[in-house]
């Protein structure tokens, strides 16, 4: 049988740094108010780079690190809720920029679960035997979706991109995965609505910026994500002691605190970087993974078991246990 493995990781964030104190100068908030509720101290905000620009930086790094030629890449998946445009896809722009002429490319929209969903799909593509090498990138410029007069959401989000190179392997590396969607709760977190605009249609007011029921999302993350992770471990015969690190979507430090207690895994196994990047949606997990590899916490030698778990709009949530 053919399986997939993560062979390279990379990330990139815009240079411009916006601190909580910077935000306090343009809205009614403070560093103490933001940090005590979220664990976020600063975030990177793009000045002139689009989502595709961030993703291209990651793709270039992955190619350089791997030594592969661009025409060896079979597919590119970009997980994003903030594409440059509805058409063409962000992934198509990445494919063109790196001259991956043999690759097919598409975007995936699953909000903050996007990277996990995309990685699960990419694993199946390689397992089919039809493809050998693929890129999975999470990239966001959420700053363009934020209402900068709404302190409840404006303080949360940042821009960035991270990604992995997947290669075919004789050994199984994606050990377990449950993916979930509950569209009945979709109104808890919305952004980028469009309205009918033809002369034959009745239009309605569309909500363009991020709107969130914070309490509902907080409760969802604690309840549903924790339950999913516990079920995942039970069904896969992988115990909490087998997990080396937990890389969860970087939405809120208090969410990580509560999930750690719920699943009874030591808090120190939960890596975090939301204090420096904020919530970067589909980019948060691959950025965290790339930084952990840079720091030597994750070795990419196939000896560690890592829990990846995303959750967000849709509502969507999903987890993978990956040998890496």
UniProtKB/Swiss-Prot annotation:
It is found in: Cytoplasm. GO terms for biological process: fatty acid biosynthetic process. Its main location: cytoplasm. Keywords: Acyltransferase, Cytoplasm, Fatty acid biosynthesis, Fatty acid metabolism, Lipid biosynthesis, Lipid metabolism, Multifunctional enzyme, Transferase. Transmembrane segments: none annotated. This is Beta-ketoacyl-[acyl-carrier-protein] synthase III. Belongs to the thiolase-like superfamily. FabH family. HAMAP family: FabH. Residues 250-254 are annotated as: ACP-binding.
